[in-house]
Design a protein with these regions (language model features):
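Conserved ankyrin/ankyrin-like repeat signature
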Residues: 42, 75-76, 107-108, 142-143, ...
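Hydrophobic h-region of N-terminal signal peptides that target proteins for export
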Residues: 19-27
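Ankyrin-repeat boundary/"N-cap" motif
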Residues: 29-31, 57-64, 90-97, 122-132, ...
């Protein structure tokens, strides 16, 4: 039996590795592009081929679910939820709830509230406070109402130790006051 050993030049080996790395990078980047602006069908097809990318973080530390939510791509975000996306990851910019409050994405926030997500998330507390504090600071009235309806803890104190009533006084906003009383 004759064994044939094929050898490759260093340039061919480098080219092969570059192709493998670039190919992985392209597929990896694709999930983030689809999260931002792809369709549900496109994401479904992608996840069938690359299910391990469901909770992969981008080079900026963001998940496909967070990107879809932030960009208002709610159909894709819902698909990612159905597939088991991690909804409790603490990002440098805060939690998923903080992103939804910031973008005023009531549709997804209501879905998460109904599914029992932790409304008293302390992710990035020093920077953003509890979600209820963040919503109050941004004057997201509908979000505040949704959080109250979802039984958010109203006894939590902000980063400076102020309770909800003190914050209501500080904000001096009749709409916020009305939501709590």
């Amino acid at each position: 039996m004759k064994v044939v050993v094929k050898t490759y030049s260093k340039d061919k080996v480098k080219l092969l590795f570059a192709f493998l790395i670039f190919g992985f990078s392209v597929h990896s980047q694709r999930i983030f592009d689809l999260a931002r602006s792809g369709t549900v069908d496109q994401m479904q097809v992608h996840l069938q081929s690359y299910p391990e990318q469901l909770n992969q973080l981008s080079e900026n530390g963001l998940s496909p679910f967070l990107l879809a939510s932030y960009h208002g791509n709610n159909g894709v975000a819902k698909l990612l939820m159905e597939k088991g996306a991690n909804l409790s990851h603490c990002y440098d910019e805060g939690s998923v709830i903080h992103a939804l409050i910031y973008k005023n994405n009531l549709e997804l926030l209501e879905l998460l509230v109904n599914q029992g997500i932790n409304l008293n998330d302390t992710c990035q507390f020093a920077q953003l406070g509890y979600p209820i504090h963040f919503a109050m600071a941004l004057k997201r009235y509908e979000v505040i109402a949704l959080l109250i309806k979802g039984n958010v803890d109203l006894n939590v104190k902000d980063q400076q130790g102020r309770d909800i009533n003190q914050l209501i006084s500080i904000y001096n906003d009749p709409k916020i006051d009305e939501l709590f009383h």
